[in-house]
């Protein structure tokens, strides 16, 4: 399950680091199982119970009726099995809007984030729990059916026609939880909520500030030691998403294969990174960028950050390299507190 172990650690640290100043009467917490992971939602304020009820319903609807690749009644399943025929969606439907966002991010990252890798992920067994190493010929054939150019999406006054060409299929797992967090944020705002923490299986959103006015403090997991952490981030109104090699992997003949695939090769990305944490004001972007930056490697990730900043999309990074360094961007200079006992070398980037 993607980021499930990360979810547990983040939840533990989030609760332990933010509890000061809060009382049980001021908050409501609910644990939800959706999107193949355990989610922990905590909402503060008078409308907390009603807001959580709405949030849980929204999550189950997204999971079961919209985004599941395997549930035959879901919209994504129907699209993936449409055999090249155009599927019409309403103007307010969630799935085409999410696909549009995924295509936009794929273009912005020059394909480092690619939502069309469904058949390649299946071949590796990461979506089926039947792990294996595909042959080079098999990967070459599967990759010929990937690429966002095979997704035709239009937005009209009446709705969204979507067509998948040449056997293309979508896997939105790299963006779905972030997008869901965006929707939950909007739902909570409608309910009048101003303070909350949403941990959607490791995709964490801290809404507003704590009720005492201070920032939330979230621990970032150590990819080499799942019982420890790299450091603590102070944040308000931010999404914090981590992608790492420890989340889903298997070993064969002494080689470890992780689930973050390079869209160009169809193989696990070898970028010099073992973990990427993104902090951003948008959940879908944070989710997808964590994957893209991992694929791009340190230099590519930092170049992408600069490019997107020029276009009005700002985000911060914590990069863990395979030689034991932790690189964090200048926007975190006062917000990230390294764990000096972790054994890493920390570098604040100018």
Predicted regions, residues:
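Mature catalytic core of soluble alpha/beta enzymes
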Residues: 2-8, 12-350
């Amino acid at each position: 399950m993607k980021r499930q172990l990360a979810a547990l650690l983040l939840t533990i640290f989030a609760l332990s680091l933010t509890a000061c100043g809060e009382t049980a009467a001021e908050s409501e917490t609910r644990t939800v199982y959706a999107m193949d992971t355990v989610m922990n939602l905590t909402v503060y304020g008078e409308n907390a119970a009603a807001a959580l009820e709405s949030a849980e319903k929204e999550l189950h609807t997204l999971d079961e009726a919209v985004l599941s690749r395997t549930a035959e009644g879901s919209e994504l399943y129907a699209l993936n099995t449409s055999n090249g025929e155009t599927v019409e969606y309403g103007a307010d439907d969630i799935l085409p809007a999410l696909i549009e966002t995924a295509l936009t991010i794929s273009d912005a990252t020059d394909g480092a984030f690619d939502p069309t890798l469904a058949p390649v992920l299946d071949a590796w067994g990461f979506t089926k729990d039947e792990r294996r190493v595909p042959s080079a010929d098999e990967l070459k054939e599967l990759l010929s059916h990937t690429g966002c150019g095979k997704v035709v999406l239009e937005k009209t006054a009446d709705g969204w026609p979507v067509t998948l060409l040449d056997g293309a299929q979508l896997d939105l797992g790299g963006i779905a939880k972030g997008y869901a967090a965006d929707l939950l944020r909007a739902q909570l705002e409608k309910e009048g909520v101003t303070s909350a923490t949403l941990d959607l299986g490791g995709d964490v959103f801290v809404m507003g500030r704590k009720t005492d006015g201070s920032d939330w403090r979230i621990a970032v997991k150590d990819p080499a030691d799942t019982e420890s952490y790299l450091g603590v981030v102070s944040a308000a109104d931010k999404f914090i998403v981590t992608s790492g090699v420890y989340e889903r992997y298997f070993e064969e003949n002494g080689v470890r294969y992780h689930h973050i695939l390079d869209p160009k090769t169809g193989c696990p990305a070898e970028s010099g990174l073992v973990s990427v944490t993104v902090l951003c004001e948008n959940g879908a972007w944070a989710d997808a960028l964590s994957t893209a930056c991992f694929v791009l490697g340190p230099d590519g990730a930092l170049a992408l950050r600069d490019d997107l900043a020029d276009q009005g999309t700002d985000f911060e990074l914590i990069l863990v390299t395979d030689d034991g360094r932790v690189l964090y961007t200048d926007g975190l200079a006062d917000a990230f507190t390294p764990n000096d006992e972790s054994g890493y070398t920390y570098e604040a980037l100018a």
